[in-house]
Amino acid sequence: MGKGLALTMSAKWKAGLLALAMLAACGNDKGAPSPLGQAVGSVAKATLGGIKARRAGKAGTAQAPAPVTRADLEKYGIPILRAVIASRGADALLTISDDKGEVVTWSTTDGTTFSLRNGVLIQTRGMGPDLMSAQVPTLGMLGQTGGTHQRMYYFLGPEDQPTRRTYDCTMSLKGRETITIFDRKHTVTHVTETCVRPQGKIENEFWLEGATVRKSRQWASGLTGYIEFEKAVD
């Protein structure tokens, strides 16, 4: 994965704070810091200073870091998506870099991007072996218990030759649940998409809140594995 996500730390509060700091680093085209950057810069510096102090044996002088809260995110008035990739130890907050209606592209500060169509992953860039494109179910199809469809993933193989994986998929209903994302509870419908082919099986999960995919766990590639997305701020 690109540098932006790689900079996040394994501890949850470190990951959240540094991800927020990365989000804050985006400024205008003249290089001026964004309002978000100005707001969290001092917190990030203080926290990193505390980490260095503890490493130097000065834990007694280090203050406990403040966790990233919903208020921290919402006051800037921009949509924010959280992405967690367990296989890479990555946990980051993403902002929109391109919006074409149904297809929205979210990015890190170093240009790693994730494109989702109505919340369903169709493309990645900057992650090494990328998902070049995908044929995926519509939002309506996700809610059809027992519904079936084909899902196709397109990758680049040896010598940049395109390869395709085709799965036969079935939707199933897990039920109504309440999930919490950055201190806010959401009542959602949990559905599972089970996809099979002769060489194996994958399982994608979606937590639907009306017409919004509030949370998901989606397979991206053999190397990356699954990515968990949370729509933190609309």
Label the model's feature ranges.
Residues 133-142:
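Surface-exposed beta-loop interaction hotspot
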Residues 2-16:
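Bacterial N-terminal signal peptides that target proteins for export
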Residues 23-25:
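C-terminal motif of bacterial Sec signal peptides marking the signal peptidase cleavage site
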Residues 27-130, 145-234:
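Acidic, serine/threonine-rich low-complexity disordered tracts
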